[in-house]
């Protein structure tokens, strides 16, 4: 079963003239586990290895290189690019976010992205 906080390779479809991430890349599952178990879709946040780029954005969360993550380099979660995909877009499981504080930061970044904090609206 797909679980929140697990990192998979995901196929993000290319969109011409877009700034969105595309191709096969790592992503963190952020949808809740009840939906993950029952729905045909899953919500993910793509990762980028360009950790120096726009670190100041409140929707960017640094993912440090830690044992168990399966990542080969530190990464940046791009919460502004959250996307719901068919589960068939999931590739191989890479690992998981092993630091609970990182998942807490990612949850806040997602709340900022959807406008849940008035200070960002």
Describe the residue ranges of each PLM region:
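Compact nucleic-acid interaction/catalytic patches
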Residues: 17-24, 29-65
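C-terminal terminal-subdomain/extension
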Residues: 66-121
């Amino acid at each position: 079963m797909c679980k929140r906080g697990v990192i998979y390779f995901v196929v993000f479809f290319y969109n011409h003239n877009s700034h969105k991430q595309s191709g096969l890349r790592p992503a963190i599952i952020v949808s809740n586990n009840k939906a993950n178990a029952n729905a045909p879709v899953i919500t993910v946040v793509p990762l980028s290895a360009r950790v120096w780029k726009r670190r100041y954005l409140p929707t960017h969360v640094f993912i440090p290189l830690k044992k168990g993550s399966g990542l080969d380099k530190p990464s940046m979660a791009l919460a502004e690019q959250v996307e719901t995909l068919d589960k068939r877009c999931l590739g191989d499981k890479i690992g998981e976010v092993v630091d609970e504080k990182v998942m807490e930061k990612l949850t806040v970044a997602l709340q900022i992205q959807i406008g849940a904090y008035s200070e960002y609206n």
